[in-house]
């Protein structure tokens, strides 16, 4: 009735073996813990069979209808076989299934033997390695010279890198200085062009003023010629009048004193001369005032032009400074954008890695949950099997007790009363453990426990 158990302590593992008569394959999951073992039953289609013991080099099998499928109720060396089809049917073992059980037991025994031999070899190798290392110390080569050479090369590399960085900084500074000089040259060229354009404008104004001066001088000359012509005409008229008066007779008449023509002519001459002088003076004054006004306008316009040019120069300098600052801001913006893009790319890659890790962890968690559910189902199945096996054990115990009751109490005494079969103590409600039993009473036949399975 008792099954053989193996005392071992190993880690868990799995083994895939061929199936029974119907083909297919079976997965053998082994869990090595303490010193006891239990094996559940196989099931394929309508039949079921159980393996109750596994030993080193030998095995024993019996049908599920005859013996329980587990050796011990808890702990130990457990081997579970899961195949296609339902769990725990009724039937007997066939020849192929017995061969499969024999094959599995042989394989398991060989595996345990190999594990033991490998553990012994490992211990022996460790002992040999520790003893060899302690006995003979290997010579350690001297790498100090190589280290010194490496340090010198590293120092040279650092010096070269610093020199390269300094040269790069100098090149950048030279480029910036060249850009500044280029901008200054462009500003000076633009200023020279503006000054040349202003000079051309002033030349035009000077030419216009020169033309005006020439016109005024021509007008003065024409006025002088006109004055000379008037003087000449006046002299001719005076001479003609004198000639006319000289040819006449002098007649003295007692009358009012005559008018002195010479005096009148002299007065007229003086009047005309004063009038001409006034006209000349007025023309000169007008010319001088116009010239002074023009000179003042030229001076004021030149001063305004200089002030405007100074303002233009200052504005251009401000514009150049603002352009340089704008270029610096653009370069800073480009650098910040590149840094932002690099940061986004780095964090996106890190985020992708984190998401991948999260996905892996979630998949592992899902697998763990599936394993937990599967183990829970297996545990429930094993609990069901345990309950059924305890029920069968109680049934077998009742049968054995009934067989014991059938035997006579005193076999040597003569039988004077009719024999009655003695039934086993039946449980009050069910065949579960811990239930109360009824007293033995003679019955004509032995009845199994209700709810038991054969």
From Swiss-Prot:
InterPro entries: IF_conserved (IPR018039), IF_rod_dom (IPR039008), Keratin_I (IPR002957). Gene3D superfamilies: 1.20.5.170, Single helix bin, Vasodilator-stimulated phosphoprotein. Residues 98-125 are annotated as: Coil 1A. Belongs to the intermediate filament family. It holds the Pfam family Filament. Residues 404-454 are annotated as: Tail. Residues 143-243 are annotated as: Coil 1B. The lineage of its organism: Eukaryota, Metazoa, Chordata, Craniata, Vertebrata. GO terms for molecular function: structural molecule activity. One of its GO terms (cellular component) is cytoskeleton. This is Keratin, type I cuticular Ha5. The keyword Coiled coil applies. Residues 260-403 are annotated as: Coil 2. The record marks 345 as: Stutter. Residues 1-97 are annotated as: Head. Keywords: Coiled coil, Intermediate filament, Keratin. Residues 134-142 are annotated as: Linker 1. Residues 97-407 form the IF rod domain.
